[in-house]
Regions:
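Histidine-anchored nucleotide/phosphate-binding helix
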Residues: 126-142
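Conserved hydrophobic positions within beta-strands
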Residues: 26-28
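Hydrophobic alpha-helical positions that pack around
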Residues: 146-246
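Acidic low-complexity segments
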Residues: 30, 35-87, 92, 101, ...
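Short, well-structured beta-strand-loop connectors
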Residues: 1-10, 30
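Gly-rich Lys/Arg/Thr-decorated short loops/hinges at beta-loop-alpha junctions or inter-strand turns
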Residues: 55-56, 107-121
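Short, Lys/Arg- and Gly-enriched loop/turn segments at beta-strand edges
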Residues: 11-23, 37-41, 55-57
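Short acidic, glycine/serine/threonine-rich loops at helix termini
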Residues: 40, 58-60, 90, 97-98, ...
Length: 246
């Protein structure tokens, strides 16, 4: 029997390992070959969902005192053990970004969805704005950045408002909510950096070389879950659209 958040395997990559956690509770009923989103056929552990979603015993919230005592290495290990990867589409392990040797001055939260029909981050910001800001503060602590920025489109004043209200709960941090353009591809990392910070990162260069690191707002929410609640990535907001929906 496995529980939500329980470690059930490890993905061994060419340059890094990623833990895999159960997203449901239930009994293991076997192994099967399945086609991964990458197109590769991989081994899968099959867990029969009992719909109870029983949390694993390890998923216990940290106190504010415990979080205040965390070091940079602690943050890296927490994020690594949570399996958190870029939720803006890259799927790149988040802990790798935290291991940069470059000094980071500013963390940018990307809340700009520029592909047609996508509104999952929009919905996440509306419903989890406080947690996103809290996740941003953890990312700032993990990188040593003194400045945090969350970028959203100008055409969504409601997103600016909820984030601005949430920001006031974290007055000890220098956090700014920036309204950027509505054009495509505003959500592209380098374009977001340019319009949110004024820093131009040349194509082919890493943002960290210019003192910037960027995380999607869903990834920042993942920071909150991992650091505060000791929860790995077991769920996310998704967009379903099209004429076939009934």
């Amino acid at each position: 029997y496995v529980k939500v958040g329980e470690l059930i395997g490890t993905r061994h990559g060419g340059f890094f390992d990623q833990p895999i956690h159960s997203t449901v509770s239930g009994y293991v009923v076997g192994f099967e070959k399945k086609v991964h989103s990458s197109g590769q056929t991989v081994d899968c552990l099959i867990v029969k969902n009992d719909k109870k979603y029983v949390l694993h015993e390890s998923c216990v919230s940290r106190t504010d005192e415990e979080i205040a005592a965390l070091t940079k290495d602690d943050y890296i290990n927490i994020i690594k053990d949570s399996g958190l990867s870029g939720l803006g589409g890259s799927g790149f392990p988040t802990y790798i970004k935290l291991q940069t040797k470059h000094p980071i001055d500013v963390v940018v939260g990307n809340g700009v969805e520029c592909e047609p029909n996508l509104i999952s981050d929009y919905k996440l910001i509306l419903e989890r704005s406080h947690r996103i800001i809290e996740g941003l503060t953890y990312a700032m602590r993990a990188t040593g950045a003194k400045k945090g920025i969350i970028a959203v489109k100008k055409k969504y004043p409601e997103l600016f408002e909820v984030l601005e209200n949430a920001r006031h709960s974290f007055t000890e941090f220098d956090i700014e909510i920036k309204r950027v353009g509505n054009h495509y591809p505003q959500g592209w990392e380098l374009d977001t950096i340019k319009h949110a910070t004024g820093i131009e990162v040349p194509v082919g260069k890493l943002p960290a070389e210019y003192g910037v690191t960027v995380f999607n707002v869903a990834t920042l929410y993942g920071f909150y879950r991992a650091v505060k609640r000791r929860m790995p990535i077991t769920e996310r907001f998704v967009t379903i659209s099209g004429n076939g929906i009934k």
